Structure formats: structure tokens, C-alpha cells
């Protein structure tokens, strides 16, 4: 219905209600009286009619969408009616010196009941009849706090929503059996599976954006038992900043099931390192590198250099940052290979960065077993080139992105990352630059990680391939890993290897099961197949070796590990002679070097 038609309809309806109310009010007190023989009542009716329409326009009673009527709309009706009656009483007093108090009181009551009833009846009709005729999914809302009730209200008010809330669950005992917008709190989160059956629930929305850690993991696991579709609210900060609305639900991701409390950052110390400075990120097009760029830009650097050898990935992160930050600071995309020493020196000399985040590396374990020379070239020589250039041109802080696979490494990739750590620790002894490394476990969602592989296998009907039923890994999210890198740079005094307390390791088998269930399938439908441990893989991973001292946390959940350094000549020998070595010989050399074995004498003897 157009606004003009709506206005005409409500104007005529209200006119009838006004005249009917004053007539009935007088008739109740003075039955069988001829209404037209009482001049004051005619004057009062005209006054009430005119004043009602004036105040109705003043309080926008003709503009409101009454299908979404609530307490605010009722208050507006009461104000408009009360003021209309007050004006009528004033006119009666002026004309006759008397006020028909009882008539006006009855008129006031009928007026509010009929005006309010006419407006709210449409909402009741829509909620209880029209919505039932739609094909809507019965929805359970987990959490009856501010977020949960906001979700319920928006679902009830959105006539096009596919979801209709039928129940809440909440662990606050005081809310038990309370109703919010007509939806009852029927129990706590431990009853989710039973509530789903009792109320024929087809959809679950988890509306607890502030809850963290093991508690949210427990709630997700309770929801998974029900085998219905599960969604969750966006993050509170995203809602507050206007990035998303409260009803833009997202799928539950495996990252949500980690149950990890995020690391709280020292924003002030990070800001001092970044704001107004020139920042260089190598590997800027990769999963970790691109996220470091996003996080860095939040702190308003003077200039950010996006360095990488893949033009497509650099182009994508460049465009993303330009669209987000416009002309707030300078963004410079640089296509370069960290293996090209001359090019890296040119870049450092030209731009003179204050902070370098070195994320460029080969990270795929099985691939590097087959390509050890490429691993050395990129992870060892590439790191040496960037770190040496940083030293030469006075970079204040250099942060190496390392891996938990550098601890007691059993593969080429982990060994080259450990040797890269040794290189920057050696430089830290004499350089004015603060060199640090950051170790963390597997990053969920990064390119080449297990999650994208599992998702692809599920999409094709399975089975999901797991190397071993008992294999475990430490996991963290890409944003968390990137923030840790930035925090390490802020904490750096030189030569440290920072390690994150990553909580409990996760079984890959459990990860696969959770992902299958979150995708809406049963384990039996998709299946899990064991493929065996691949070359270079460990059953279990560590964050610190036995010979590394685990000190007290230097920051909440961040520790410093001390490592044993190898003689510099052994690393120099590797860099000078790796191209001449056979693959098996090179594999043995880097593994021995990374595990603090005397490899130089053996290599020279051969």
C-alpha cells in the first residue's frame, strides 16, 4: 500500500474512532440522549477530531510501520490521545465554564483502546496468521541476553525471514521460563539436544558473541549433537563498527571449535612501532603476510611496502587495502624475489623501512621433502638476504615468521626454518637491528592447510583422508597468528624466539569429524580414510625443544625460548655448497644442522 493510500485509510479510520469514542462515552453516562441536541458535545467532537489529527501528525502516527509496532508506538498513541482530550477539556471550559470530566475520561479510554487496537491488530494478524502460512524454519536461539533477544526481535519483525524463533536456551537460572517477545526460555544449554526434539527445531542460532574459550566449544558440541543446521552471530566488534548487522548470521567454522581464548594485545606498544613508520612485509600476498598487512594498516603507518613474487596475490592485497584505506597512507606493491640479493638491497636502500615482517617462505612439508634445494634457496638464503639488508640499512625491528616445525625438526621445511632462526640470532649479536622470530603452530585456513583440503573432499562426497588416527597438531587462526607477529615485534629486544601458549593440541581426526558434521553430513555418509604419515611428518609437534629454556611469560600467553646456536661456518658452508649436493645429502645436512649436530666435518670428508 502506498503512503498516500495508507494516510487516507488511517485518517478516515481515526476520524471514525474519535467520533465513536466520544459518542459512546456520553451514551454510557446519558443513555437515550439525542446527541445532536447538545451543542457542547458537537463542539467537543469537532475539537477532539481536529486536535487528534494535529497530534497524530506531530507524533508520526500516520507514518509508522505498524507491523513492527512496539512499546514506543504505544507511548506515542497515549501522548497524542491525552493531549487531544486535554485540548477538548480546555475548549469545554472556555465555552461553558465547565468540563465533562467523566465523559472525557470514558472517551480517553475508548480512544486509546480503539486507536491502539486498530494499529496492533495488524501486527498480531501478521505474527500469528500470515507468518504461519510461510515456509519458515523453527529456530532455537542459544542465549537470551541482549544479543539473543535482539536476534529474536529482528527475526519476528522481518516478514521475509526464513526463520521463526520458537524457544531460547540460557544458562542463567533467573531467566528460566521468562518470555522475550513471546518466545520462552525453556532450559539451559545442556538441554539443547532435548529442546530440539521437543520443539521440532530445524535451525539453531548461537547468539553469544562475547563468550570465549572452552565454554563456547562446549556449546558448539552440544549443538552438533542435534544434527540440525547451526549458525552463529557476527563478532561484537563487527556489529559495533557497522561492518555487519546483527541478523547477518554466519556458518559455524572449525576455527570456532578450537575453544581458544584470543591473545590480548598491547595496542599502545604496537602502535608506537607502526604508526607513522615505514613497514615492509615480505610474502605480503600469502595467507599470513596479507593478514599482517591488514593488521598493520589499522595502526596508520606512514607507508606500507607489499613485497612478493606472485603478481596476482600482491595485486589482490594491494587493491583490498586501497579500497579500505583510500589515501590515508602510502601503499606500495613490490614484485620481487627474496632470493635476489641485489634487488632486496635496492628496495631497502630506496624505502628505508623501520620495521620488517618477513613472512615469505616455502611452508609445505611434503613438497619441500621432494625439493630441498628450493627450500634452502627460499627459507635460508631468502631470509639471509632480507635480514642482512635490514642490518645494512638500519631497520629498527626485524620479525621472522617461523614455525613449530622448527623444533627438533624431522623434515626439510622445519629444518630450513630453524636455520633461518639461527641466521637472525647470529645477526642479533652485532646488529643495531632488533632481530626476533615468532613460532606458532598450524594456521587454519591458510593455503595448503588441512581445512581447505577437507572441505574439498567433503564437497566431492568424501572420503576425508587423515594420515593417522592419533596425529595431533597445534592450531591457531590467521588473524591470531598475525597479531602475535606484531606483538613480538613490539616486545623485541633482540635475538629472542617468541612462542605462543597454544593450549592443547588438537587431533586431526577430531577436526575432520567436526568439519563433516558442520557441513551437514554424518561421519558414515562421508567416511574417513587413513592415508599414512607422509614424508617428513611428525605424529606430534612441539613448540620448544628439550634444550630450550621455557621462561615465564613475557606477555600474556607469550613466552621466550632460548636456543642453541650452531657455528656460523656450518651455515655459510650450506649456503655456499647446497647446489652441489645431491638431494639425499642435502636433506641429511640441513636436518643435522638444524638439530645441532656436527655436520661440517662429515660433509667435508665426503
Where are these regions (language model features)?
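Flexible, Lys/Arg-rich cytosolic regulatory linkers and terminal tails that connect or flank
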Residues: 220-278, 391
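Conserved Rossmann-fold cofactor-binding substructure of NAD(P)-dependent oxidoreductases
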Residues: 335-355
Amino acid at each position: 500500500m502506498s503512503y498516500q493510500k495508507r494516510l487516507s485509510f488511517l485518517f478516515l479510520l481515526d476520524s471514525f474512532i474519535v467520533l465513536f469514542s466520544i459518542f459512546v462515552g456520553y451514551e454510557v453516562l446519558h443513555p437515550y440522549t439525542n446527541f445532536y441536541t447538545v451543542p457542547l458535545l458537537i463542539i467537543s467532537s469537532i475539537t477532539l477530531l481536529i486536535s487528534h489529527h494535529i497530534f497524530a501528525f506531530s507524533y508520526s502516527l500516520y507514518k509508522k510501520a505498524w507491523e513492527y509496532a512496539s512499546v514506543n508506538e504505544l507511548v506515542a498513541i497515549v501522548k497524542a490521545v491525552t493531549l487531544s482530550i486535554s485540548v477538548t477539556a480546555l475548549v469545554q471550559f472556555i465555552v461553558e465554564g465547565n468540563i465533562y470530566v467523566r465523559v472525557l475520561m470514558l472517551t480517553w479510554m475508548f480512544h486509546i483502546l480503539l486507536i491502539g487496537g486498530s494499529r496492533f491488530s495488524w501486527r498480531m494478524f501478521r505474527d500469528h496468521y500470515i507468518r504461519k502460512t510461510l515456509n519458515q524454519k523453527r529456530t532455537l536461539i542459544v542465549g537470551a541476553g541482549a544479543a539473543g533477544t535482539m536476534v529474536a526481535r529482528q527475526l519476528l519483525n522481518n516478514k521475509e525471514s526464513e526463520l521463526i524463533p520458537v524457544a531460547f536456551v540460557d544458562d542463567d537460572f533467573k531467566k528460566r521460563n521468562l518470555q522475550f517477545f513471546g518466545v520462552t526460555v525453556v532450559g539451559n544449554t545442556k538441554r539443547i539436544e532435548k529442546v530440539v526434539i521437543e520443539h521440532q527445531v530445524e535451525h539453531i542460532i548461537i547468539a553469544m558473541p562475547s563468550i570465549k574459550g572452552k565454554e563456547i566449544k562446549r556449546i558448539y558440541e552440544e549443538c552438533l549433537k542435534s544434527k540440525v543446521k547451526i549458525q552463529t552471530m557476527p563478532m561484537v566488534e563487527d556489529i559495533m563498527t557497522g561492518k555487519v548487522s546483527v541478523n547477518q548470521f554466519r556458518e559455524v567454522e572449525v576455527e570456532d571449535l578450537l575453544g581458544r581464548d584470543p591473545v590480548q594485545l598491547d595496542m599502545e606498544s604496537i602502535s608506537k612501532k607502526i604508526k607513522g613508520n615505514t613497514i615492509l612485509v615480505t610474502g605480503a600476498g600469502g595467507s599470513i603476510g596479507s593478514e599482517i598487512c591488514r593488521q598493520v594498516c589499522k595502526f596508520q603507518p606512514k607507508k606500507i611496502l607489499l613485497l612478493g613474487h606472485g603478481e596476482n596475490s600482491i595485486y589482490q592485497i594491494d587493491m583490498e587495502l586501497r579500497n579500505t584505506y583510500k589515501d590515508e597512507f602510502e601503499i606500495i606493491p613490490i614484485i620481487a624475489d627474496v632470493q635476489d640479493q641485489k634487488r632486496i638491497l635496492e628496495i631497502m636502500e630506496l624505502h628505508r623501512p623501520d620495521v620488517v615482517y618477513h613472512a615469505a617462505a616455502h611452508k609445505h612439508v611434503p613438497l619441500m621433502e621432494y625439493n630441498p634445494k628450493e627450500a634452502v634457496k627460499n627459507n635460508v638464503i631468502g631470509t639471509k638476504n632480507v635480514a642482512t639488508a635490514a642490518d645494512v640499512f638500519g631497520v629498527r625491528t626485524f620479525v621472522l615468521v617461523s614455525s613449530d616445525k622448527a623444533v627438533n625438526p624431522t623434515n626439510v621445511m622445519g629444518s630450513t626454518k630453524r636455520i633461518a632462526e639461527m641466521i637472525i640470532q647470529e645477526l642479533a649479536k652485532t646488529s643495531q637491528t632488533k632481530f626476533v622470530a615468532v613460532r606458532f603452530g598450524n594456521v587454519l585456513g591458510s593455503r595448503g592447510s588441512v581445512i581447505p583440503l577437507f572441505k574439498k573432499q567433503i564437497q566431492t562426497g568424501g572420503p576425508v583422508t587423515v594420515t593417522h588416527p592419533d596425529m595431533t597438531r597445534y592450531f591457531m587462526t590467521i588473524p591470531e597468528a598475525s597479531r602475535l607477529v606484531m606483538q613480538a615485534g613490539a616486545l623485541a629486544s633482540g635475538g629472542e624466539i617468541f612462542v605462543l601458549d597454544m593450549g592443547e593440541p588438537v587431533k586431526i581426526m577430531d577436526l575432520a569429524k567436526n568439519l563433516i558434521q558442520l557441513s551437514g553430513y554424518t561421519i558414515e555418509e562421508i567416511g574417513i580414510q587413513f592415508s599414512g604419515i607422509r614424508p617428513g611428518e611428525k605424529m606430534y609437534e612441539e613448540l620448544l625443544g628439550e634444550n630450550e629454556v621455557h621462561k615465564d611469560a613475557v606477555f600474556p600467553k607469550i613466552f621466550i625460548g632460548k636456543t642453541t646456536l650452531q657455528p656460523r661456518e656450518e651455515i655459510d658452508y650450506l649456503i655456499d655448497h647446497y647446489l652441489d649436493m645431491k638431494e639425499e645429502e642435502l636433506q641429511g645436512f640441513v636436518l643435522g644442522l638444524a638439530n645441532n649436530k656436527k655436520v661440517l666435518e662429515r660433509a667435508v670428508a665426503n
